[in-house]
Amino acid sequence: LLDRRHVGLQVRQGNIMSKRPYMICTSCIMDTSDSNISFDQRGRCDYCNNYYDNILPNWHPDERGEREIMEVAEQIKRDGKDRDHDCIIGVSGGVDSSYLVVLAKEKLGLRPLIFHVDAGWNSQQSVNNIEKLVDGLGLDLHTEVINWLEMKDLQLAFFKAQVPHLDTPQDHAFFAALYNFAAKHGVKYVLTGANYSTECVREPLEWHYHASDLLQLKDIHRQFGTRELKTFPLADIFTYKLYYRFVKGIRVVKPLNNFPYLKEEAMQELADRFGWQKYAHKHYESRFTRFYEGYWLPKKFGFDKRRAHFSSLILTGQLSRDEALRKIAQPAYDEEMMAQDFEYIATKLDLTTAELQALLDGPNKSYHDYKNRMGMINLGTLALRAVGLQKMIIR
C-alpha cells in the first residue's frame, strides 16, 4: 500500500506521474492524493473554503428549508394525483436512500415507487434492509435485474482498462435504469439521497470519474469487452441532464438537504424502527463496492475515498478531525474479509486469483487515457456554477 505520509508522494496527472510535497488540510483530512488540491495560507484546503463560502450560506436544513420542500411536495402530489405513485426513489439499501424513503412517506406525505437495481453484487444485508423498509412502510418495490453476463463483461473491461473508476458499470446501470424507467413511464419526479451533510466534499475525478460519460464507457468496452451490451441500461449524461429534464420534464429533488440529517442518528432510527442493519462504511452495501473502495483503490492507486467521506462529516460537525485521522490510519475493513473478497470477486468474474492479482499489479491509467466528454462536462459544470446551481467542487 502506498504510504502517503511521506514527502514526495507520487500523484498521477493524466499519463504523467509528477511529484508534489505532501500536504494535508489543517481543517479536514483531504490531502495531496488529490493532485489538484490547493491550500490557503492557513493550510486550509479549497474544499473547506468552498464549503464555508458557497455551500453553508445556501444550505437550509431548517424551517426555511422544510417550508420550501413542503411546497415542492404539494406540487408533486398535485401532479401525481391520478397516478399510483407520484414520484420514484432509487434505493441501494444504504442509509441515504433508506432515510429518504422514510422522509418521503412520513414527512412529505408522498407515494413513492421504490426502485432497485440488482447488478449482481448485492449483499444479503442490503436486500434485507430494502425489504424491511418497503414492508414496514407499505410501499411498492420495482426491481430491475441486470443481465449478469453483460455486467460481468463490462466490469472485466474496466479492470483491463486499468482505470480507478471500476464502479462505473454498476453506477451507470443504477442511474440509467432509473431514469430510463422514469422517462418511459411518465414519472415526473425523481427523489435522490444526494446531500450536503455527508457529501459536501466530492471525490476528485481522478479517483472516481463520471459514471454517466457514455462515450468513455463505450470506448473502454469496445477495446476490452467481448460481449454485446444488448440489454444493459445506457443513458448519456446529456440525455439525463438535458433531454430527460427539458423534453420529458423529469425533475430531480433532493429532500435530505431540507431537513437536519445526521448520519448516525438516521442509521439508529432506521435500525430501531425497521430492524435495518448498519454497514461498516458508506457504499459498503455492495460487496463489489466494498472491495473496490476499501481494498483495490488504496492498494493500486493510493486513493482512499474515506478521506472525502470523513472530511464531509468533519465539516458538518459529525466527526472530529482527530477521530477521522485515527480511522483513516486503519484499513477500511477487516483484512481477513479483504482476502475473502479478493477470492470471491475473482471467482464471480471467472478469473483466477493470479489473474486478478496481475490486473492489480498492471500499469495504472486514468480517464484521460480513453475517449471522454470531459470538455463538454466542464463547460456544463462552469455554467451551472455561474448561475449558482452547482455549489460543490467537481474536478
Where do the protein language model's features map onto the residues?
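Nucleotide-activated chemistry modules centered on ATP-dependent adenylation/adenylyltransferase
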Residues: 12-14, 18-87, 103-395
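Hydrophobic positions on the alpha1 helix immediately C-terminal to the Walker A/P-loop
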Residues: 99-100
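Short, glycine-rich nucleotide/cofactor-binding loops
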Residues: 87-96
